């Protein structure tokens, strides 16, 4: 289990490194300052701060998407469905950003709104991050520094291991989010036996890390979206998994170890490997085959009876 934990951490530091590389290439990748948006529905999780973090939370905009960094106080923001549509299922949504920033729009709020439209109570987890430079100029310099992207090869050779990082803060935040949903399940119309978790990029890593290591989270299903694909040690009580990645994502590299791990453990798994989409596509980008993943996810939930209307009667 410890080996799996370290592999996950290494994979998502690689995400940050390679994802940042694309900034110097993308014409619309300029980093702009952004005033912190109002988050009137964000609920503090009170999980503590971040050691050696002198900078306060700040925001920036890139590719038209609001991003948050230097997060020291985790929050959970509910996106509740119309009561006429509500089916009792809940999903914790974890945005990505290499554990150094969070893509709050593309991989957070927009996804939560789409889930709520389908009758699902969605909860965006703004989890604590590793420290970055205090000033936006210094942060931009760091992100734009020269680096070599991994070569595009068809083999599944394991890339060099990046430095290891601790995800204990992030796991604590995820556990606190889950506990809050359970505690307020009746108020929010949530069936505590139908709480799932999906994440994007590093958020997929946190979703997987929570599944493999949490002693308190009992997810009904998980959905890692363009996350690490290496093999893992699957717990006996692991939930069904819906997994998405594109062949032109630098994380793919021909690997499907996590899929094999789930299959070999005898736990239901669905895998969608798309022709194109790259990395960080959120709900989708124009002209990419990966654009239909959300529809497939909804159908998967439907077939597995998570979208059936449910009269919530929780026994905590």
Sequence positions of predicted segments:
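N-terminal cap/lid segment of alpha/beta-hydrolase-fold proteins
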Residues: 28-85
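Short beta-strand element of the alpha/beta-hydrolase
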Residues: 87-96
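Short amphipathic alpha-helix adjacent to the substrate-entry channel of hydrolases
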Residues: 105-124, 260
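Alpha/beta-hydrolase active-site loop
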Residues: 138-186, 293-296
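Primarily recognizes the serine-hydrolase "nucleophile elbow" in alpha/beta-hydrolase
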Residues: 165-238
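Short beta-strand/loop motif that positions the catalytic acidic residue
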Residues: 242-245
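Acidic catalytic loop of the alpha/beta-hydrolase fold
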Residues: 247-253
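C-terminal catalytic histidine-bearing segment of alpha/beta-hydrolase fold enzymes
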Residues: 268-316
